[in-house]
Amino acid sequence: MAGHSKFANIKHRKAAQDSKRGKIFTKLIREIIVATKDGGPEAENNPRLRAAVDKALSNNMTRDTINRAVKRGAGGDGEADLETVIYEGYGPAGTAVMVECMTDNRNRTVSGVRNAFSKSGGNLGTDGSVNYLFDKKGVISYAAGLDEDVMMEAALESGAEDIETNDDGSIDVYTTPSDFGAVKDALDAAGFDSVNAEVTLVPSTKADLDLETAPKLLRLIDALEDLDDVQEVYHNGEITDEIAEQL
């Protein structure tokens, strides 16, 4: 399926966030610890842990660091007592925003999230206000130049839902969360090395942004991601390459 990658629009800012790598690693380690506590230390039997490990590897985390995080979770590390909370809201141009947090104090967390929305021209919504606009999926991304037919055969035979070839030739493979590990393993075995792999929220509809609204959304995302309790920020804002180049 040809088209402009929904996933690329969600993640288009990641390359500019190297300065935040320490904070990103902290959040990845936290997810591994909690996933281990909730589902056990064996990634093959724990889809959440498998997804967390693959995401950590995509962000160049070492196996030693990952293994230490798993051991902390299996040993009852205090961070494993955190709970996952998702807040929903609206950004500029009616963009839908989902904020995934891990917290031991909901009052502190919601206060920070609400403040970030209000300072950036958005609004914190109620439960269910925008989550229907997102689907939870595994997304495995590949650079351009690969044999799409061979990849499609391997992906679909292993349970992939869809394959999307983007305008730049890169490829995104979509899976259900439960099939994510099996599809990733099959594509690895077929010789395809991914550039990113994670279970994420993919928007089913998009909100087009212009030169006025795109910077406002980016400021909102930055404000949210700077909060220690925030793990991930998802949105359905669509920023074209032409707009992105002018930001």
From Swiss-Prot:
Gene Ontology CC, one term: cytosol
SUPFAM superfamilies to which the protein is assigned, alphabetical: YebC-like (SSF75625)
Gene3D superfamilies named in the record: 1.10.10.200, 3.30.70.980
Compartments where located: Cytoplasm
InterPro entries found in the cross-reference section: Integrase-like_N, TACO1_YebC-like_2nd/3rd_dom, TACO1_YebC_N, Transcrip_reg_TACO1-like, Transcrip_reg_TACO1-like_dom3, YebC-like
Sorted UniProt keywords: Cytoplasm, DNA-binding, Transcription, Transcription regulation
An example Gene Ontology molecular-function term: DNA binding
Residues passing through the membrane, by range: none
Any Gene Ontology biological process: regulation of DNA-templated transcription
Signal sequence interval, chain numbering: none
Similarity comment text for this entry: Belongs to the TACO1 family.
Protein's name according to its UniProt entry: Probable transcriptional regulatory protein PBPRA1113
Record organism: Photobacterium profundum (strain SS9)
